[in-house]
Amino acid sequence: MSSLSDQLSSFKKKVANQPIYAKPQPRQPASPTPTAYLNSNDGHSSAASSPGSYSLKKKRSKTSLVYSQPADSGVGTHYLSQLHYAVEYLKERNEPKTAEEIASYLSTPLTPMLLNLLKKNNRIYYDERNETFTFKPLHNIRSGAGLLAYLDSQKTHVGMSIKELRDGWPNVTVELEELEKQGEVLLLRTRKDGVPKMVWRNDKSCDCHVDKEFQQVWHEIPIPPTLDLASELGKYGLKPTSVDPSTVKRAGHNQTPKQKKPKTRRGKITNTHLNILRDYSSMKP
């Protein structure tokens, strides 16, 4: 025990004799004085004399930058943008325009690159003789007479989209309504707004006179409700368009159900040689 106490006392003496070092404190940046703010606008000399104000100005200049907003990239001066504006201009005017007129509308001179793009565009027709540009619609139809001639040339009575006709015929709706009143075309309108959507050629050879008596009989035929229409058609063996035809059961003659034949066992007995299968009842006393 004495040796342990001696060791403990010697350890305490060594710890007590060791020098004490102070913990280094972090240096606080000196706050700029009011004179530094006043001298910050004097030039480079004042900035060099007061380093605190220089660092403060540098930090503020960094925070003023906004990195989320890209720099001005010149939107509208790109070739494809100018080409789009030129095509829309020719589409609205719907007449041949020279390069000078297009440049006046774009407020920029036509460079050789832009002229080459205009000439090779599939929606623009370039007349080399007159050096004019014309918008090329999806269908080269610009009047009612042209529409009737195009529909008559078709082998089938296929309709046309009015949206496609409006591409090169701005006032197509007004003229189509006049043709409808004359009985030249048939229009399909939207259910909500009644705006024409499709147009067909009206075949006047299909027009026939029907007496009012037959018209009255036709309108007096009762029509079942929409929910019962499919079942009513199915009773007569008809195929409703809203129902799968394979699920419709046609009404036929009352046929008796076929009876299934009993299955006959076609097995062959091979153990007839055994005596146990013989009848010995006659041998009883």
Swiss-Prot record:
Task: List UniProt keywords, sorted A-Z.
Answer: DNA-binding, Nucleus, Transcription, Transcription regulation
Identify the DNA-binding region of this protein by residue numbers.
Answer: 67-142
Output compositional bias ranges, type Basic residues.
Answer: 258-268
Question: Polar residues bias located where?
Answer: 1-10, 33-44
Q: Provide the residue span(s) of the region labelled Disordered.
A: 1-56, 240-272
Entry's Gene Ontology molecular function annotations: DNA binding; RNA polymerase II general transcription initiation factor activity
What is the protein's major site of localization?
A: nucleus
Any signal peptide, and if so, which residues? none
Q: Quote the biased-composition stretches of kind Low complexity, using this chain's numbering.
A: 45-55
Family statement = Belongs to the TFIIE beta subunit family.
Question: What is the protein name stated in its UniProt record?
Answer: Transcription initiation factor IIE subunit beta
Q: Which organism is it from?
A: Schizosaccharomyces pombe (strain 972 / ATCC 24843) (Fission yeast)
Question: Gene encoding this chain?
Answer: tfa2
